C-alpha cells in the first residue's frame, strides 16, 4: 500500500483522478486541509485545518461502486458502535452521531473506455 500526504491540496479525490495513471493499486492520499473538498452532487465539503480526517483511497479492482459505498458506511458505523457511540447511516452515504453529520463517503469511478479504478473518499 502506498501513502501520500499533503499539508494542503484542492481535493484528495481530485488528486487521484488527475494522477491515477501514475498511482499504484491500494494508494491512500491524505490531506490536512482541502481548499475544494466536495461531496456527492458537487456539494462543497468544508473542514478546518487538522480538524477532520481527509483522505481518499484508490483501487484498481472492478467492483460495484454502490456496494463499496454501502460497505464503507457500514464498516464505519460498526466500529463506532463497538466504541459505544450511537452512529447511524443516512442513506446513501452519510454517517451521523446525535443527529449531526460527521462523515460522508464519496465513491467515484474512473473510466477510459473501461474501468480504470475506483476512488473512495
Regions found by a protein language model. Name each.
Residues 1-85, 103, 108-113:
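N-terminal lobe of the biotin/lipoate ligase/transferase fold
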Residues 34-36, 91, 120:
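Short conserved micro-motifs on helix faces and helix-strand junctions that flank
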Residues 113-121:
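Short, acidic (Asp/Glu-rich) active-site segment that either coordinates a divalent metal cofactor
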Amino acid at each position: 500500500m502506498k501513502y501520500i500526504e499533503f499539508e494542503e491540496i484542492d481535493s484528495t479525490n481530485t488528486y487521484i483522478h488527475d494522477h491515477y495513471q501514475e498511482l499504484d493499486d491500494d494508494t491512500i492520499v491524505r490531506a490536512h486541509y482541502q481548499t475544494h473538498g466536495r461531496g456527492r452532487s458537487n456539494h462543497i465539503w468544508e473542514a478546518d485545518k487538522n480538524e477532520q480526517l481527509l483522505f481518499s483511497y484508490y483501487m484498481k479492482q472492478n467492483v460495484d461502486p454502490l456496494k463499496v459505498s454501502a460497505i464503507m458506511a457500514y464498516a464505519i458505523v460498526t466500529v463506532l458502535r463497538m466504541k459505544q457511540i450511537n452512529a447511524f447511516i443516512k442513506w446513501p452515504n452519510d454517517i451521523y452521531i446525535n443527529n449531526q453529520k460527521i462523515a460522508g463517503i464519496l465513491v467515484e469511478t474512473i473510466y477510459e473506455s473501461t474501468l480504470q479504478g475506483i476512488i473512495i473518499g
